[in-house]
From Swiss-Prot:
Domains: entry comment: The BH3 motif is required for the interaction with Bcl-2 proteins and cytotoxicity.
Organism: Rattus norvegicus (Rat)
GO CC terms of this entry: Bcl-2 family protein complex; cytoplasm; cytosol; intracellular membrane-bounded organelle; membrane; mitochondrion
Subunit structure: Forms heterodimers with a number of antiapoptotic Bcl-2 proteins, including MCL1, BCL2, BCL2L1 isoform Bcl-X(L), BCL2A1/BFL-1, and BCL2L2/BCLW. Does not heterodimerize with proapoptotic proteins such as BAD, BOK or BAK. Identified in a complex containing BCL2L11, DYNLL1 and BCL2L1 isoform Bcl-X(L); BH3 integrity is required for BCL2L1-binding. Interacts with YWHAZ. When phosphorylated, interacts with TRIM2; this interaction is associated with ubiquitination and degradation. Interacts (via BH3) with MCL1; this interaction may sequester BCL2L11 and prevent its pro-apoptotic activity.
This protein's name: Bcl-2-like protein 11
Main location: membrane
Protein family: Belongs to the Bcl-2 family.
């Protein structure tokens, strides 16, 4: 049975201007429906391997009516140029037909999820696992609250201690670096003494 000219044109448009031979399996992404593989097989009747470029639609025009399986495929978004514009047989655009865009969700019972759908599902599961790991069990919550309170008390003590050191007298603040130097010298002296 010979193919209709519109089928040849749509296959030409999908394959970039050339039909694939029947011996070679088509190059489809993993997980594509098998119905697409049988639809995009080569030309079994031996008609020419080139598309008719003299057609009114031209070699790069969108197909007039895609097959029933092409609209379900995630690759259909690359075949169709606009969901609002359609070409009639004369090659002019018309707004008469109502074409709704293909649904973006994946049907879990008939096909594997598309890569964007897989990435989104992975993101959701990763966010859920992060939330679960951030929630502490009931046993650790009192200890964490006590640790936070101790840290707050320590921060307040450090803040008040540094204020007192600089507020009392500037001489004491000036003597402070000398004490640090004396302690450093004492530490060095102990290291040297232990080595001998």
């Amino acid at each position: 049975m010979a193919k209709q000219p519109s089928d040849v044109n749509s296959e030409c448009d999908r394959e970039g201007g050339q039909l694939q031979p029947a011996e070679r399996p088509p190059q489809l992404r993993p997980g594509a429906p098998t119905s697409l593989q049988t639809e995009s097989q080569g030309n079994p009747d031996g008609e020419g391997d080139r598309c008719p470029h003299g057609s009114p639609q031209g070699p790069l025009a969108p197909p007039a009516s895609p097959g029933p399986f092409a609209t379900r495929s995630p690759l259909f978004i690359f075949v169709r140029r606009s969901s609002l514009l359609s070409r009639s047989s004369s090659g002019y655009f018309s707004f008469d037909t109502d074409r709704s865009p293909a649904p973006m969700s994946c049907d879990k019972s008939t096909q594997t999820p598309s890569p964007p759908c897989q990435a989104f599902n992975h993101y959701l599961s990763a966010m859920a696992s992060i939330r679960q790991s951030q929630e502490e069990p009931e046993d650790l919550r009192p200890e964490i609250r006590i640790a936070q309170e101790l840290r707050r008390i320590g921060d307040e003590f450090n803040e008040t201690y540094t204020r007192r050191a600089f507020a009392n007298d500037y001489r004491e603040a000036e003597d402070h670096p000398q004490m640090v130097i004396l302690q450093l010298l004492r530490f060095i002296f102990r290291l040297v003494w232990r080595r001998h």
